[in-house]
Amino acid sequence: MSRVGSKIINVPENVKVFIESGMVHAEGPKGKLSTKINDGINVKINEKEIVCFPKQKDRQSLAFWGLQRNLVNNIVIGVGEGFIKKLEMNGVGYRASVKGTNLELLLGFSHPILYPIPQDLEIKVDKQNNIEISGASKQLVGQVASEIRSFRGPEPYKGKGIKYADEHIVRKEGKKK
């Protein structure tokens, strides 16, 4: 019995969910999202709740049961409330700014890095070194945050670089004479 898969998904009042041609579609104030239903999983929508359960008790269906439930839950939460990832920049001269449809990053390289902002996301920069990425798709928000972080990941000696706001960097001691 899957502990994650057997949980019921509650649908908020402002979100509309329906199943069409093997896809679960959700519409809400933050936009529209959809996810494919796995072949071994059934998804039922009752009033204001969604239930996922496997068609058969084979190994593969049971493995995808919890995954399918979480994918459906993520689109329901995404179109209702949205997801937010926060990044912090530490380092002398490290700055960020939004210029049109690009995020400009000054990270100590000889050139600025221009990162194109996807249409479905909103990026805000606060005090030139705090970046907030928000959007309906949890996968896209996390992927963009990861790509921005990868330009200059945090280093363990001085803590310079881009890190998630809730991330703890294990610091190392420098070389001793």
List PLM regions with ranges.
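N-terminal intrinsically disordered, cationic/polar leader segments
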Residues: 2-146, 150-164, 168-177
